[in-house]
From Swiss-Prot:
Binds 1 Mg(2+) ion per subunit. The modification N6-carboxylysine is found at K201. GO terms for biological process: photorespiration; reductive pentose-phosphate cycle. The lineage of its organism: Eukaryota, Viridiplantae, Streptophyta, Embryophyta, Tracheophyta. This is Ribulose bisphosphate carboxylase large chain. Its cofactor is Mg(2+). GO terms for cellular component: chloroplast.
Length: 475
């Protein structure tokens, strides 16, 4: 570089390191309707001021780096930088606070959850100045959400396809999840569907293993679906897991499912990745397939209160990336989920407009405009005694899935399905008659047992099964 060039490069530029808060902490900033807003739970290292830590998050997740660079002068940082515009303490946690960060829309590629997360959570979580960092919520503006297709079909279109209204949908995960041959797997699918379930399901890790290759499973499950439909007169489905080691293989499995004429496929969206999931969702929209989403690996990301990402953020990301169902916890079963928090992100999945409500963990008002909704799936350690609570908590627009609670019935798979269908119909009827399921639920189930021996047997076998542990994810 010539001396003349060096002089020009140094005009208005002072090398060195300066506090992030001098540039990225802007409490006077008024957020715009087009900004993406983030709420971070920040735990700074001892001696790091709250303003500096919040500004560091804004900087490292947008335009900043650890030192001043002269190329800052070649762009407009005021236009593109993230801004920490507010900081508030976390009640009961002296070392934690919530940092609110606003990101200008131009920082993100349209229609790409992958790019959104790479920017906002891709690098900053390893920052040494922070002991821990958790993304609690995102506000996605309509200007950005409209660049996504969203769910392939949505709740109303799914009900129309299935011709099922006025009640939750009923499902079952085939167990044991691994080890069955394709033919025996298909037999279990048939028995459960024949007994009265709407859906059966591959578990998240059922892909294409030596004991059951994917093509064989798809064929036997399709046979089971058609046989059960012919015998019951109801539309049935099985979530055929298309998740694979490559996107090309995943799409090949989805194409084969469509050729078989089945109504729904499945994807593990976190282990499979957002790019793969969005591609599959677009294919499902174009080809009339419903898309069931499993959240395998979510607890690695969202379980800890002070680090990672809350599931409400993953739920919003899924609604944009695309899925017609997603597992959302049960509140009453074996998996983590506090009631108010769970219902907060259930509303974020289903509703068009969700008001800010900190009592349910919703940090921002979210307007999805016309994006279709996603059915929440309650699954994990639930059985017939849970049916009143599940019906009352989740309402009609949900899928209730009983794996062990169906296949663990003492009389077999079909009677297990009958027991769950009878329990569901009894709870829906009682609710429609004005009865309080939260208070009278057990009595509703006992009354139904009088005319359903299958339900009576299920109630007897699971009458003392409870999962009573403290919930970690509290507000």
């Amino acid at each position: 570089m010539s001396p003349k060039t060096e002089t020009k490069a140094s005009v208005g530029f002072k090398a060195g390191v300066k506090d992030y808060r001098l540039t990225y902490y802007t409490p006077e900033y008024q957020t715009k309707d087009t900004d993406i807003l983030a709420a971070f739970r920040v735990t700074p290292q001892p001696g790091v001021p709250a303003e500096e830590a919040g500004a560091a998050v804004a900087a490292e997740s947008s335009t900043g780096t650890w030192t001043t660079v002269w190329t800052d002068g070649l762009t407009s940082l005021d236009r593109y930088k993230g801004r920490c515009y507010d900081i508030e303490p976390v009640p009961g946690e002296e070392t934690q606070f919530i940092a609110y960060v606003a990101y200008p829309l131009d920082l993100f590629e349209e229609g790409s959850v992958t790019n959104l997360f790479t920017s906002i959570v891709g690098n900053v979580f390893g920052f040494k100045a922070l002991r821990a960092l958790r993304l609690e919520d995102l506000r996605i503006p309509p200007a950005y959400s409209k660049t996504f297709q969203g769910p392939p079909h949505g709740i109303q279109v799914e009900r129309d396809k299935l011709n099922k209204y006025g009640r939750p949908l009923l499902g079952c995960t085939i167990k044991p999840k691994l080890g069955l041959s394709a033919k025996n797997y298909g037999r279990a699918v048939y028995e459960c569907l024949r007994g009265g379930l709407d859906f059966t399901k591959d578990d998240e890790n059922v892909n294409s293993q030596p004991f059951m290759r994917w093509r064989d499973r798809f064929v036997f499950c399709a046979e089971a679906i058609y046989k059960a439909q012919a015998e019951t007169g109801e539309i049935k489905g099985h979530y055929l897991n298309a998740t694979a080691g490559t996107c090309e293989e995943m799409m090949k499995r989805a194409v084969f499912a469509r050729e078989l004429g089945v109504p729904i496929v499945m994807h593990d969206y976190l282990t499979g990745g957002f790019t793969a999931n969005t591609s599959l969702a677009h294919y499902c929209r174009d080809n009339g397939l419903l898309l069931h989403i499993h959240r395998a690996m979510h607890a690695v990301i969202d379980r800890q209160r002070n680090h990672g990402m809350h599931f409400r953020v993953l739920a919003k990301a899924l609604r944009m990336s695309g899925g017609d169902h997603i597992h959302a916890g049960t509140v009453v079963g074996k998996l983590e989920g506090e009631r108010d928090v769970t219902l907060g992100f259930v509303d974020l999945l289903r509703d068009d407009f969700i008001e800010k409500d900190r009592s349910r963990g919703i940090y921002f008002t979210q307007d999805w405009v016309s994006m279709p909704g996603v059915l929440p799936v309650a699954s994990g350690g639930i059985h017939v005694w849970h049916m009143p609570a599940l019906t009352e908590i989740f309402g009609d627009d949900s899928v209730l899935q009983f794996g062990g609670g169906t296949l663990g019935h003492p009389w077999g798979n079909a009677p297990g399905a009958v027991a769950n269908r009878v329990a569901l119909e009894a709870c829906v009827q009682a609710r429609n008659e004005g009865r309080d399921l939260a208070r009278e639920g057990n009595e509703v189930i006992r009354e139904a047992c009088k005319w359903s021996p299958e339900l009576a047997a299920a109630c007897e076998i699971w009458k003392e099964i409870k999962f009573e542990f403290d919930v970690i994810d509290r507000l």
